[in-house]
Amino acid sequence: MALSITRGLLLLAALCCLAPISLAGVLQGHAVQETDDTSHQEAACHKIAPNLANFAFSIYHHLAHQSNTSNIFFSPVSIASAFAMLSLGAKGNTHTEILKGLGFNLTELAEAEIHKGFQHLLHTLNQPNHQLQLTTGNGLFINESAKLVDTFLEDVKNLYHSEAFSINFRDAEEAKKKINDYVEKGSHGKIVELVKVLDPNTVFALVNYISFKGKWEKPFEMKHTTERDFHVDEQTTVKVPMMNRLGMFDLHYCDKLASWVLLLDYVGNVTACFILPDLGKLQQLEDKLNNELLAKFLEKKYASSANLHLPKLSISETYDLKSVLGDVGITEVFSDRADLSGITKEQPLKVSKALHKAALTIDEKGTEAVGSTFLEAIPMSLPPDVEFNRPFLCILYDRNTKSPLFVGKVVNPTQA
């Protein structure tokens, strides 16, 4: 007799919707308690930060090898936290694959410490800050007739700050609307229509989103934005609005990467790292860039004068994570061999779909903030022109948690 496999849905929106596991046993049936000790929280999330960075580069390399003509933009924090939450309900090899694929070695870091790290990471990112808007959220949509394991529900709520909603997946259109409305609201309207089609046999959907809006510490002036050429490749050139500012920047040239490295701070704790390779050196940059180099860029401060040109852009990318995560060894959870018995005992589960959508907007202000004028003293010698007028990399990094929030490559700024 054929085994009946019920579907779980995983959606990520710089954002992710997924199916979770039960690690309640490892955590002794109780979620890690919240703490007001900021230094303790930082220490917990710092333990998983190197793993998140390595995971980010693993995903980036997979996407880059798939296509060198497309924009790339994703949130490693969103994807990793969603699948770590899924691991709370996974058993056996399914459980092992997920944590190993995320870059964790349980002989080096106990599983309870991994989940505590994510708990404190999400808690820290969600701290109110009037200077920037950085929010993350997890929503668990459960079919009205489904009975989920209590310890799983407890752990996803306490560890991953997940909200739980009862929903009728048989009414696929209404269920789709509720999930999309939840994501759109949580992402401040930046991520819409994440779910295009919803299988009525779905038992649960786990949605994770992360949304960021930041103000540049030193905004660009709109009057200096002009239309200029952006060279997509040797045959293709497009016109883009190019922001411009003459001043002092955290900017240096990296011989190893044959690239300019620019760090622009947002008001608050987020830094944008832009990496512009020399002509014909994009492959060299992608092959050699790693967590260790990124850490060095973020640690050392440079002060260089430059005439900077940076394109205004608004891009979004959507990924089916089944193939992406297969490249890092996470496969069983999508197959009929999946063991997600920590989520429900009633029937076998597998993740039928894992979607991730991320959106990026770069403009003069960074957000709706009122622009300001900055006056800076620069050397009398003519500063170099550094113009991001060809494909470049972009990494948004949270200094509090030492985590890469978003990673991307801009190949064509006009591709929405």
From Swiss-Prot:
Quick one: which gene encodes this?
SERPINA1
Instruction: Tell me yes or no: is rRNA processing among this UniProt entry's keywords.
Output: no
The name this protein carries in UniProt is Alpha-1-antiproteinase
Ranges for the region named RCL are 371-390
Glycosylation positions in this chain: N68, N105, N143, N269
Where does the entry say this protein is expressed, by tissue?
Plasma.
Q: What is known of its domains?
A: The reactive center loop (RCL) extends out from the body of the protein and directs binding to the target protease. The protease cleaves the serpin at the reactive site within the RCL, establishing a covalent linkage between the carboxyl group of the serpin reactive site and the serine hydroxyl of the protease. The resulting inactive serpin-protease complex is highly stable.
- List, alphabetically, the Gene3D superfamilies matched: Alpha-1-antitrypsin, domain 1 (2.30.39.10), Antithrombin, subunit I, domain 2 (3.30.497.10), Serpins superfamily (2.10.310.10)
Cellular component annotations (GO), alphabetically ordered: endoplasmic reticulum; extracellular space; Golgi apparatus
Which SMART domains does this chain map to? SERPIN
